Amino acid sequence: DVPVLRISAKTGEGFDQLIELLGQTGDFGRRVLDIDYDTYAEGEAELGWLNSSLQLAADEPFDLDELLLDVVTRLAGRLEEQQAEAAHLKVIGLWEGFFGVANLVSSEDRPELSLPSNCQVRTVEMIVNARVACDPEWLEQVVRAEVVGAVDSRGASVEFRQVQSFRPGRPVPTHRFDRGD
C-alpha cells in the first residue's frame, strides 16, 4: 500500500499532507522500484531536446519580462501549428543579478511568466530550454526564428552563443539495486 499525494508547487496544494507524511517515523525508503527502461527510452525518443544560451543587446531599454513571455508565446504558437506537444519549455533572462522566467509546461496550458524580473534592460543573457515531441532539428530552426522575431521587434540584436538540439539516448543507470534475498 503506497500513499499517493497530489502536490502543487504552484498553488501549495498537498504540502501539509506531505509534511505530515515526512514527519512519520518508521522503516521507510526500502522499496526498490522496478523501472522498465525500454518504456522510458521509448518516451524519451519521442522528444526533441534543445538547450541554448544567447546574448541580446539593444540601444534602448526594453521590458525583460515582456520579451521572455513573447518568446514563449511565439514558440507555443508554432508548436500548436505543428501539433507538437510541449513537455517543457522555459526561457530565462539574466541581467546584473536579476532574472525572470517564462514557461509552458503543457500544450494544453497558456504560456506564463512564472518569475518576473521587473527589469528594463539593454543587454541580457537568455537561456532557452525545451523538451518537445518533435524533430530536434526542426525545434532548433523554430527557436532561432522566433527568438530573432521577438528580439527584432524590440530593436535589439541577438547572438546565439551555444545551441544543442538532439534526441536523448537510452538511459543507462550507473547504479542499480539487485533484488537479492
Question: For the regions a protein language model found, what residue spans apply to each?
Answer:
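Canonical P-loop GTPase G-domain recognition
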Residues: 1-44
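P-loop NTP-binding site
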Residues: 27, 31-181
